[in-house]
């Protein structure tokens, strides 16, 4: 039983390592199965990030305007997860912008190629800008 509880701890640490920039170094061997199993702890990592952002928001709002608080919170959010979600949003939007040729196999291959490309396209950049703007506006609205 002790070995299983240690595995759960490993998986929890892996989820934080994957979804945040919190420096958790794995001092054990990590298998593909371990990485897959860590997904069960993704909500925990998300709740932790949400707690940090909520406490930061409440604290900052005591000292700054809602506009400045919103901007700082968006910055903390991006820094906390290393822009991981924005990169995924950008890649997805770029892939969805690939025009269809009618050949499903070819279109799928092209979309996967675009998603794998490290360059950000116009649609991806627009999606990032809109996502950041909307996050800022939603946070600002909380304190009006």
Model features per residue range: what roles?
Residues 1-82, 90-109, 117-144:
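Hydrophobic alpha-helical transmembrane segments
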Residues 87:
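Hydrophobic "anchor" residues on beta-strands that sit immediately upstream
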